[in-house]
Structures are given as C-alpha cells and as structure tokens.
A protein has these predicted regions:
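Canonical tetratricopeptide repeat
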Residues: 61-65, 99, 133-136, 167, ...
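Register position in tetratricopeptide repeats
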Residues: 35-36, 69-72, 106-107, 140-141, ...
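N-terminal leader/linker segments that initiate helical-solenoid repeat arrays
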Residues: 18-65, 72, 81
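Short coil turns that delineate tetratricopeptide repeat
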Residues: 54-57, 91, 125, 159, ...
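Helix-start (N-cap) detector for alpha-helical repeat units in TPR-like alpha-solenoids
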Residues: 23-24, 57-61, 94-95, 128-129, ...
Length: 235
C-alpha cells in the first residue's frame, strides 16, 4: 500500500517559531522531489529534516514517508527499519501499521504481517485492507475457517468488494465447494454489462478463476471457452 503522508507538518508553519521554518522547507523539498519521482533526493531531504529536529513529534510521518520512498526503491529492509522508527513514535498509527504489514508480505514474513493486520483490526474492526490481507494469509495457512470469517466480514462492510468476492470464491474452490464457487463467480461475471468500475483485466481474471473451477469439475470444454474469453479481454 503506497501511502505518502506529507501533511500536518506543513499546515502548522504559520504558528511555529522561525527556527522550525527550515524543518518545513526541508519537508516541502522532499514533497517536491517525491512528486517528481526523484526518490534519492527526497530521501536526502527527509533525513536532513530528521537530523535537524530529532525530537519533533511529526517525525513519525517523516519516517513513514521515508519507508515508502525506500520501498519504492526496493530497499525493503531499510523501509522496514523506517516504519519501525515511525511506530516507535506513533504505535497505533493505522496507515503506518498497514505500510509495515505490506513490507512484511513482500519479505515473505507473513506471520509478522498477520500480527500487524490483527492490530489494525483491533483499532479499526472494519478496515477493508486488513480484512482482505489477513484472509489471504489465513488461506495460505490453510486456516479456511478464519479466512472465511474475514472474507464474510469484509463483504458485510463492502458487499461489492471485487477482491473480497473473488477471494471467497477461491476459498470455496479450495475447500471443494465448487458449486458455491461457481455461483459467486457467475454472479460477478453476470454483472459485466452493469459494473463499469471493473477493468477488462479484472473481468479476465474472473473468467480464469471460473475456468479453474470448471477444470476441477472436469468440464474441460467450458474451461477452454472461459480461457479464450479471458485472453480476448486481456489482449
């Protein structure tokens, strides 16, 4: 999840003493370089701001932004360190917890990611990203009961969630509940003409998913038709 939270630091400038203006200017330069995708320069200015005012309470945001910039440069261990520093300052900051969980997932540390998603859900019980990703982790662990609980909770919060419905269909398939998986996928595909928010690639994924269920049911001809439709949509 990409969250750059360059925010309240800049909003308080008018009420801060003159020495803090330099801190804000450094933050502003970091924002500018980030928007220009000049990430090494943005990182340099954030580090200068952190060095200038190491006790500034807004440094949680700067460390979080630094982590996101490092992640975009594939410096995953450094990004993790930055998110840890941010959470040392603001341990209940949901966006930062979600960012760290994403890094853990990219590093293959799913158990640690799961802990962060669970903490997020303790703070925000209906957080969609945390529900979706924890359900995915449970499914990888073959804890299908817990995965289903998270998918169903997600769909109560957002009944039209594409990833939630597709995830639940995949879960039903893994449990051998092929007819239920087909029902979910058929419903999503049937709304193709009505739902214009989904891209052709997203619809192609639905046809691929349905082809997988049809293959499990030994309906090879139907699976091939769906795969051809998926290729057509994604071309």
């Amino acid at each position: 999840m990409k969250k750059l939270i360059f925010l309240a630091v800049c909003l308080l400038a008018s009420g801060m003493p003159a020495f803090a203006q330099t801190y804000q200017e450094l933050c502003d330069r970091a924002v500018t370089y980030t928007e220009q995708d000049s990430l090494p320069q943005a990182e340099t200015y954030i580090r200068r701001a952190l060095k200038l005012e190491p006790a500034n309470p807004h440094n949680a945001l700067l460390f979080s932004n630094l982590g996101t910039i490092q992640r975009r440069q594939r410096k995953y261990e450094k990004a993790l360190e930055s998110y840890n520093f941010a959470l040392n300052i603001a341990p209940r900051a949901v966006p930062i917890l979600l960012n760290r969980a994403t890094i853990y997932m990219e590093l293959g540390r799913n158990n640690l990611a799961q802990a962060d998603y669970s903490l997020v859900l303790d703070l925000e019980k209906d957080n969609e990203e945390a529900l979706l990703m924890r359900a995915y982790i449970y499914m990888q662990q073959r804890d299908y009961k817990m995965a289903k609980a998270d998918y169903e909770r997600l769909l109560k919060v957002n009944p039209t969630s594409y990833n939630g419905r597709l995830g639940l269909a995949t879960l039903e398939q893994r449990e051998g509940k092929y007819e239920e998986a087909l029902r979910l996928l058929n419903t999503m595909i049937a709304a193709k003409g009505e739902n214009r928010q989904l891209s052709p690639s997203q619809y192609a994924m639905l046809y691929v998913a349905r082809a997988g269920v049809e293959k499990d049911l030994h309906h090879t001809d139907m699976a091939l038709v769906d795969l051809e439709e998926a290729i057509s949509l994604d071309s």
